[in-house]
C-alpha cells in the first residue's frame, strides 16, 4: 500500500513543530458514495485527529453530501447511539494531546527560567572576564568579591541589580551593563544588619553615574529609615564625563543624603581604588575613611591637571595616597596593608559602634580574668620627673579591657590620641594627650582631631574618657596665623555640647587654657579625677617662678641663685599646683591612686548610664569651623 499525504490547514494557533506534520491514510480505503458516505465520513471523523477533520478533504466530503444522506446518517447514528457512545467514550478516554498553546507556555516558562539564570550569571561577570582579570592583576577584588568577603556567608540581599543607564552619547548605548557599575543591598556582619554598596571598577571604571546616584540614594534612604550602618566600598575613576550634568546632579543628591544620614547611622567609607574629583566629597562627609595602602587614592585634581595649571610635579602617591591622607591631611582614619586588611578593619570598627543614634553603645559579656589588665602597673606609668616623656597608650591599655583599644587617626596629629576601647565590656571613647610627641601640646591638627572624635561619640551615645597630660597650646606665629584660636575653640565647643557621660583623669600636667578645654569641671564634665602626680595651674612651677620671682632671683648671689630657684619652685608646686588645691576648691572630684583608675571609671559609667541632661531649645549651634 502507498501513503497519501493529507496537508494540514494553516492555523496561527498551531505550534511550529506541528505546522508541517503529515497524517497518512490508506489509499485503498472505501471511497464515499451516496449510501455509505455518512457512515464512512462519521467513522473517519471519529478515527482521525481533529486536525485531519479540519482538512480540505474533510471539508470536501462534508460539503458534497446530499441533505438526505446527512439525515440518514443522523438517524442511523441515533438508532445505534449506545454502540456509538461506547466508541465516543473510548475516544474521550484516550490520552489528550498537549495543545499548541500549552506547549508554548511551557517553552516560554523554561526560557524565562533560563533567562534569569543567564542574567544572574551575567551579573557575576561585571564588565567581562578580561576586565576582571585586569582587576585581579592589580591586587584588587571585584565589587561582588569584596561584598562576599566582608559580609556573613549567604546574607547578602541585592537591590536593583538590573538597572541600566539611559544615555547614548559617546557610545554609551553600546556599553550598558546591569547594575551600571555598582552593587547595592543589605546583609549581615557578625549577625548585625548593615547596608552596603560596592563600586565595580570593571564597568566603565566604576565611574559615578546618574544610576549610581539613584541606587546609592535609595540605599541610604532605606538604611537611615531602618537604622542600619552604611558601608561604602569605593573604587572609581570619578564622574562619568559622558553623562554630563546628570552625573554632577547625582553627586549633589548623594552629598545631601550623606549629610542627612550624619549623626543618625554610622557611615564608613572603605577606599579600595581611586576616588577623584567631586566623588571625594562623599567619603569626606562620612564618619570614617579606611584606605588600602598602594591601591587607593583620593584627590580633587590629579597630577596631570596640577602640572598643567601650576607646573608642580607630584606623583599620585604623594598627592593622594594612603600615607598622605593618614598622616598629613587627616582624611583617612585608618590605613590597611591591603584590601583584606581594610575589610577586616571595617568589621572591627563596626563592632564598637551602635547601629544608629537611638541605640546605646555596644556592650559585651566580660570575664574578669580575661578583660582586666594589671591595674597596679598604672602606678609606674608616670616617670619620676615632669620633663620625661612616656607613651599615653600604655595608660589607656591598662585602664581598658585587654586588647580592646582601637586607635583612630593614629598617624595624624600624634600629639593627641583618640580611639575606642571596652571597659568592663562597655564601649567608650578615649581621648588623651601624648607626652611622647611634642610633650602632648595642643595644636591645630590635634584640636580638629579631638573635636571631631568627641562629636561622633556624642552623636552615637558613646561615653567619653579623657586622660590629661598637657602643658598647653603650641606657641608660634605659624599656629596663630593659621587660626589656633578658632581650632582650639572647637575642643571647648565639642566637650560643652556633648551630653554623653564624660569622665576625665588628670595624670600629670594640666596647664592654662589646655586644662580648661580638656574636659574640665568648668565645661560640665561629670566626674573629674586626678592622680597625686597631677599639676593643675596656669603654668608649671618653673615658668611661674621665673616670672613671679624674677627680681628676687636676680638679687640673689650667683652661687645661691639655683638653690633659691629650686626652693621657690617646690613651694609654688605645693601651694598652687598640687591636685589637692584644685580638689579643695571643687574643681576636682577626687584625688586617687593610679591603680584605682579603672575601678573608679567603671563605677562612674554605671551610675551615669541613664544620664539625661537638659538642653536649651535651638535649631543647632554654630561650632567655630
Feature annotation, model-predicted:
Residues 1-55, 61-63, 89-90, 94-95:
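Charged, low-complexity N-terminal segments of organelle-associated membrane proteins
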Residues 2, 13, 36, 48, ...:
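Short, low-complexity interaction segments enriched in Ser/Thr/Pro/Gly
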Residues 91, 95-625:
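Ligand-binding clefts of soluble mixed alpha/beta catalytic domains
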Residues 53-61, 70-86:
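Short hydrophobic alpha-helical membrane-entry/anchor segments
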Amino acid at each position: 500500500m502507498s501513503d497519501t499525504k493529507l496537508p494540514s490547514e494553516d492555523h496561527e494557533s498551531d505550534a511550529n513543530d506541528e505546522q508541517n506534520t503529515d497524517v497518512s491514510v490508506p489509499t485503498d480505503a472505501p471511497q464515499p458514495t451516496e449510501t455509505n458516505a455518512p457512515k464512512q465520513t462519521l467513522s473517519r471523523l471519529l478515527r482521525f485527529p481533529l486536525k485531519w477533520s479540519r482538512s480540505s478533504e474533510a471539508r470536501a466530503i462534508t460539503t458534497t453530501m446530499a441533505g438526505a444522506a446527512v439525515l440518514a446518517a443522523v438517524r442511523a447514528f441515533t438508532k445505534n447511539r449506545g454502540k456509538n457512545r461506547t466508541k465516543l467514550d473510548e475516544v474521550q478516554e484516550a490520552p489528550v494531546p498537549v495543545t499548541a498553546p500549552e506547549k508554548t507556555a511551557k517553552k516560554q516558562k523554561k526560557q524565562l527560567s533560563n533567562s534569569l539564570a543567564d542574567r544572574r550569571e551575567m551579573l557575576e561577570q561585571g564588565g567581562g572576564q578580561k576586565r576582571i582579570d585586569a582587576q585581579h592583576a592589580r591586587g584588587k577584588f571585584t565589587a561582588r568579591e569584596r561584598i562576599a568577603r566582608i559580609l556573613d556567608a549567604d546574607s547578602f540581599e541585592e537591590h536593583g541589580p538590573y538597572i541600566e543607564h539611559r544615555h547614548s552619547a559617546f557610545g554609551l548605548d553600546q556599553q550598558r551593563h546591569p547594575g551600571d557599575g555598582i552593587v547595592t543591598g543589605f546583609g549581615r556582619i557578625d549577625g548585625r544588619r548593615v547596608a552596603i554598596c560596592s563600586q565595580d571598577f570593571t564597568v566603565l571604571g566604576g565611574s559615578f553615574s546618574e544610576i549610581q546616584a539613584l541606587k546609592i540614594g535609595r540605599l541610604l534612604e532605606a538604611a537611615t529609615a531602618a537604622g542600619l550602618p552604611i558601608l561604602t566600598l569605593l573604587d572609581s575613576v570619578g564622574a562619568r564625563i559622558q553623562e554630563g550634568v546628570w552625573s554632577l546632579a547625582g553627586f549633589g543628591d548623594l552629598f545631601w543624603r550623606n549629610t542627612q544620614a550624619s549623626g543618625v547611622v554610622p557611615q564608613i567609607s572603605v577606599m579600595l581604588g581611586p576616588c577623584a574629583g567631586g566623588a571625594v566629597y562623599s567619603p569626606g562627609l562620612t564618619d570614617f575613611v579606611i584606605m588600602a595602602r598602594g591601591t587607593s587614592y583620593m584627590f580633587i585634581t590629579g597630577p596631570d591637571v596640577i602640572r598643567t595649571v601650576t607646573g608642580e610635579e607630584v606623583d599620585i602617591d604623594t598627592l593622594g595616597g594612603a600615607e598622605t591622607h593618614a598622616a598629613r591631611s587627616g582624611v583617612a582614619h585608618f590605613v590597611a596593608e591591603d584590601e583584606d586588611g581594610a575589610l577586616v578593619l571595617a568589621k572591627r570598627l563596626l563592632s564598637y559602634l551602635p547601629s544608629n543614634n537611638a541605640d546605646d553603645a555596644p556592650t559585651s559579656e566580660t570575664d574578669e580574668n580575661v578583660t582586666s589588665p594589671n591595674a597596679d602597673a598604672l602606678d609606674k606609668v608616670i616617670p619620676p620627673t615632669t620633663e620625661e616623656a612616656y607613651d599615653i597608650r600604655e595608660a589607656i591599655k591598662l585602664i581598658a579591657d585587654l586588647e580592646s583599644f582601637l586607635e583612630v587617626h593614629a598617624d595624624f596629629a600624634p600629639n593627641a590620641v583618640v580611639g575606642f576601647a571596652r571597659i568592663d565590656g562597655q564601649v567608650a571613647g578615649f581621648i588623651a594627650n601624648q607626652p611622647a610627641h611634642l610633650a602632648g601640646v595642643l595644636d591645630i591638627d590635634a584640636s580638629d582631631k579631638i573635636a571631631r572624635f568627641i562629636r561622633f561619640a556624642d552623636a552615637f551615645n558613646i561615653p567619653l574618657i579623657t586622660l590629661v597630660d598637657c602643658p598647653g597650646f603650641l606657641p608660634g606665629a605659624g599656629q596663630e596665623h593659621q587660626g589656633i584660636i578658632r581650632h582650639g575653640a572647637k575642643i571647648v565647643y565639642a566637650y560643652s555640647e556633648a551630653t554623653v557621660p564624660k569622665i576625665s583623669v588628670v595624670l600629670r600636667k594640666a596647664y592654662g587654657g589646655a586644662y580648661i578645654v580638656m574636659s574640665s569641671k568648668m565645661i560640665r564634665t561629670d566626674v573629674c579625677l586626678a592622680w597625686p602626680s597631677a599639676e593643675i595651674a596656669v603654668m608649671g612651677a618653673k615658668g611661674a617662678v621665673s616670672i613671679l620671682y624674677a627680681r628676687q632671683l636676680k638679687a640673689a648671689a650667683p652661687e645661691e641663685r639655683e638653690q633659691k630657684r629650686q626652693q621657690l619652685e617646690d613651694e609654688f608646686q605645693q601651694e598652687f599646683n598640687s591636685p589637692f588645691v584644685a580638689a579643695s576648691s571643687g574643681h576636682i572630684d577626687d584625688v586617687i591612686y593610679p591603680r584605682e583608675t579603672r575601678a573608679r571609671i567603671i563605677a562612674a559609667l554605671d551610675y551615669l548610664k541613664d544620664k539625661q541632661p537638659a538642653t536649651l531649645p535651638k535649631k543647632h549651634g554654630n561650632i567655630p569651623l
